[in-house]
Amino acid sequence: MAANIQAYLENLQQPWGQIYYDILFEQLKDIKGKRVLDFGSGFGLVANHLAQENQVLAVEPNEEMVALRTQDHPYQQLVGSLDQLESFEDASFDVILCHNVLEYVENRKAVLKAFIRLLKPGGLLSIVKPNEVGR
């Protein structure tokens, strides 16, 4: 297992890792009956949580993370990145999540443009990016 993936798994077991997801799930609790794109889905924790009451499509470029993903609830998982976004129809998602991903993306502008194209009018775009200064 890659060292960065092992470190992330270990972080999830720490109190701050658990608190992060508790807070996040509380903030996302009202998302129900929506078509959701989880871009950069990692281990599928958020996709799995939202799949309880939504139709979720998860996209993750790291095959090792996809192999270790959580899937207690049905959601579609694709391996890929920006290339996968190009295959979806305009205005096809009510909610797009991009959590802790943009710092790893080379062409952020292209990804954000794709989100604009894919998001339905009045849809929700949720972006989380760590503050590097605060780390």
Place the predicted regions along the sequence by residue:
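Class I SAM-dependent methyltransferase SAM/SAH-binding core
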Residues: F43-Q84
